[in-house]
Amino acid sequence: MNPYQNKNEYEILDAKRNNCHMSNGYPRHPLANDPQMYLRNAHYKDWLSMCNKNNPVGLIPPESFEWTWLNGTVAALTIVSVIAGILVTAPVSVTAGLITVLGAGAALLAGITPLIWPATTDNTFNKITDATEVLLNKEISEFVRKTANTKIDSLQQLIYYYQNALENWKKNPNDSAARNTVSTRFQIVNAFFVEAMPALSMPGYEVVQLGAYAQAANLHLILLREGIAYADQWNLARDPMHAAGDLHYKEFLDYRNQYINHCSTWYNEGQNEANLKNNGLVYQRTMTLFVLDLIAMFSTYDPRLYTMPIKTEILTRTIYTDGVNRNEPKSIHNPGLFRRLEQMKLHIYEYQGAQFLSGHQNIFRSMNYNHPLIYGPVQGYSSSNINKITTINLGDYDKIYSINTESRNRLVQGSTTFDKINFYGAFNENWLFSVYNQNGPIIKHSNIPGIDAPSTGLNYSNYTHYLSNCIFQSNRNGGSAPDYNTQSYVFGWNHYTIDPTGNYVTDAFEVNKNLPESRYVPQISQVPAVKASDIFNPGRVVNAKVESGPYFTGGDVIVSKAQLDGSGLARTLITFPIIPKRYRASGFRVRMYYAANHTGQVSYGVANINTTGYANFQKTFDGWEYFRARHEHFKYIEFDTTFSLRNSGQLEEHLLHIYYPNTTKISGDQLLIIDKIEFIPVGIPLNQTSEGYNTYDQNTNSYNQNYNNYNQNMDTTYQPNYDNYKQNSSGMYDNPYNQNPKDSYNQNYTDTYDSGYNNSQNVGSNYNQEYNTYNQDTENMYNQSYNNYNSDNNNYNQNSDCMCSPGYNGNYECRCNQRANGNYPK
């Protein structure tokens, strides 16, 4: 029997198969199914030209809409989309077969400034502020508005002033006058940002100015990132006790904490007030787009942690459009593992010769496509008299970007019912649900940002969100049959940067197929924790589940809660279905972004492959409530093994194991918050330089952070001791380098990844990173000692109170010197 054959009682609307499969070993879910793929073959000038247009890379032009709130929404969507595109595809130029990867810092600032200050319309600060005034029904005073505008106008002039000097220096990199000019102008703009930020958060107007504040914070952090990247050439903060850029890197970390905590605090204040005023859903959606999506990107700006382009998957949150045929007064939170909406079943009830939509069922698939479908409950009216079910099949690939509904007011009992629902798909497909009744239709468009679609403004080629959830209600108005019910929907949407077909891990993206081996540019792959497929809690001691994330993570997180009672080994297991594709890398380093209120151990392994890595996590915050964790409490730990993943594109299961000996009863919940897993490729042979990434040599499984003369006598908190770190012991670290016990980090290694991170190219690849002048005179909150490191077993024993586990070679990335100076949470 043909399962797609139409029956009298069943109708199936099926998506056409996508025949655009890549011949790269992806049997079901091609890695090329990527909304940002069109940027990957763009050279820098072409890419910059796209970004400097009012309609960048096919996105929606802000000036094409009349409504104030819509202008602000579209502007915010455009900026986040451009940031995500730049991070994942860092623009490149190719000269004589040599690829130059242009650092994301420089590209970000060049790309978003024309979006912040477009040539033909008002600036984005004002658009977003105007929209927030409408949202909150609160007008900013004339004094506050003028003060803010004065600062914004000055910022615009100073940034252009700096960018002119930057372009001049790039044309004349050996000219000392050009170098001094750009360095001076950078520092002037940086100082003005510090002075201007309070004007965007005036007392009494913190929430209404919050969107503008977030945009300014974003610009400031991008500027600092750029200065850190060029610090060596510009001689920034250079003296015998500092490495170039160290002062600005510390400021970057401090200001990032300050900005994120400020935005989190005041978003929360506004959400609470909006819920009380029955405007919670609109506030949640609007301010997520204006503020939370943007600050979630800040974690990727760290130039010493992200030394190559990033395959970003951050915005896993779901936002909801306004209810159709009903008002949804409160914000909506439904924490759970990420799932793809694969089918919808619409139940039709016939009564007195008329047909009515009476029920709706969502059918999902987890990130493991080998698992069975997940059937949600039937929402609405359920009866044995249902005589037709329309099934909408999205298949493996298609996504719905807009929904148009037609409803009718019925004379009987004043109910409202759906006649037509048109679902528009990303592959230019559409599905029509229809029943026939009388009276004129009430037409509603549901999408992000909320316009008529499909149209030139929003269609299958330029959408930013796709349908992920349908909440259906059939509210009875007094009758006993479903025809007396008012039917309503609330639709949930995910951001297009989150791939609903799987977790793809790749070591590089292809720049130009016509080039030889040098055509690949390495990239870091992110896998959000909520894109796990399973959480297994075998006992009652440890319970891990998905919880609403803090406001800066871009979505929900997995929280493991252990109540240790001394009864013996306790554990939980989280399964990540990974689809790896290696082009050139010898393997991957793996790290985890987390926060915890205790110390403990985790392991990471690959099923059916005898490889397991271990890492100790440290206590990063106090208290027994996970939602009290602030941005500065989240740290990275790296597992102590390089993972040689398959290169076939076939799904494999990765296992994150949290375990406790549980030999002693401990009071209070032991909390571990997991936000994401990241994969860093190692051993990629390339012939390229990396402008803007020139501080580091990203080589094999050693994280080279340029701490040559890092002076920590400036209120920092991390004091590592490298002297007795046993690295090549019992084969645990069988890597092609050795640690010099006299504090000289000599990476004499045949460089398989000569990317110019240390501003030198193809020079024998001997990167001598001296720690001899590392000044450990500090307040020493975190005295990290490797003296007791026992490498005779696989138990990564880190005798430390530090928040960071530094992986293989000491401090691969310590963010413990971040300090909180915000007031979040309340």
From Swiss-Prot:
The keyword DNA repair does not apply. GO terms for molecular function: signaling receptor binding; toxin activity. InterPro entries: Galactose-bd-like_sf, Pest_crys, Pest_crys_dom-III, Pest_crys_dom_I, Pest_crys_N_sf, Pest_cryst_cen_dom_sf, Pest_cryst_dom_II. Residues 720-743 have a biased composition (Polar residues). Pfam families: Endotoxin_C (PF03944), Endotoxin_M (PF00555), Endotoxin_N (PF03945). GO terms for biological process: sporulation resulting in formation of a cellular spore; symbiont-mediated killing of host cell. CDD domains: delta_endotoxin_C. Transmembrane segments: none annotated. Residues 717-743 are annotated as: Disordered. Keywords: Sporulation, Toxin, Virulence. It comes from the Bacteria. Belongs to the delta endotoxin family. Promotes colloidosmotic lysis by binding to the midgut epithelial cells of insects. Toxic segment of the protein is located in the N-terminus. This is Pesticidal crystal protein Cry27Aa.
